[in-house]
Amino acid sequence: MRLTARFLALFLGVLALLSAAHAEQAADQKLLETYKAGLTLGPEETLIDPKYPIPDYVLWLLDTARGEIGYVEERSGVTKYGTWAGYPAAEWCAEFQCWCVSRVDKQYGTKLLTRVYPNYSGTNVGRDWFIGQGRYISRTGTLPGYGSQWWKDGMTPVAANSYIPQPGDWVFLTDNASGDTSHVAMVEYCAYDANGNIRLHVIEGNNVTKPAPQGVERNDYAIDYWRILGYGTVYDLADMALKFGHSGPKVVALQEELVQAGLLEARYTTGKFGAITQECIKTVQRQAGIQETGIANLETRQALRQMIENKQP
């Protein structure tokens, strides 16, 4: 009798989990259908379905941005986006996107600005914010100041032009050889063109790469366009090499793995890559027979994961 009751409780628990998973899958499918209904593709385009579920806030953000298409700055260069940000006549591509996020927060009660998306003006600030959050993918697969990137799922290197951006991702572009950001745009969708090439379609404001940037408009770019530096992403999809002086969520994740491997005390999970973390990384490298650089690159992270697996009973 007691066994039957336990079996019934277990069965009901599994049923509840399956029901919740089905409901989540149905909700994701509904959001995808809503997203597709809002798109207007060219006659020879084939939509590339997003690889990951689309959060509801991305639909709200895209709707807000679409509602601004056609807005043109005043003759003096003043815009409502710059005015909102406190810089009325400034270059305003970033201010436009941040303004859209703020409108979503106000209308839907979300708290996206400074949590999911940055609130910024100025060169490199937005890109560096995403890097600090651990949600940035370099178009080339190599991140300046960090080195190579690799996919969290599978731990394989990020190849150049391999990431197809998600709706709601932010695209950072440059117009100079230094690689500093000079423009940002919001991904609406990605599609194959008539020749089978991938193009990303964006909504953007004040595109300084054009002769006379003035308004909010749609635009599209080849996925291998040299001006694209990378993407601030909705999801945390890629890792990167970490070294002394780095900080943020990625360092926390690394330190947590070092704790799991028995190499670091939990009290040193600070999010700052200092001397103690560096020595732990050298220990991993020494035990794995790889060069002791103190840099947590892909090879080192793979060795660390193997150490953790070896500790499992």
Predicted stretch roles:
Residues 2-22:
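Sec-dependent N-terminal signal peptides of Gram-positive bacterial secreted proteins and lipoproteins
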Residues 24-111:
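N-terminal capping segments
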Residues 25-48, 157-160, 174-239:
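Aromatic- and glycine-rich peptidoglycan recognition patches
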Residues 52, 232-271, 310-313:
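Acidic, Ser/Thr/Pro/Gly-enriched interdomain connector segments
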Residues 58, 62, 66, 94-101, ...:
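Extracytoplasmic/secreted envelope proteins and their assembly/folding machinery
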Residues 66-74, 98-106, 173-176, 256-263, ...:
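Sec-exported extracytoplasmic/periplasmic mature domains
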Residues 107-209:
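...with weaker cross-activation on analogous glycine-rich loops/strands in unrelated enzymes
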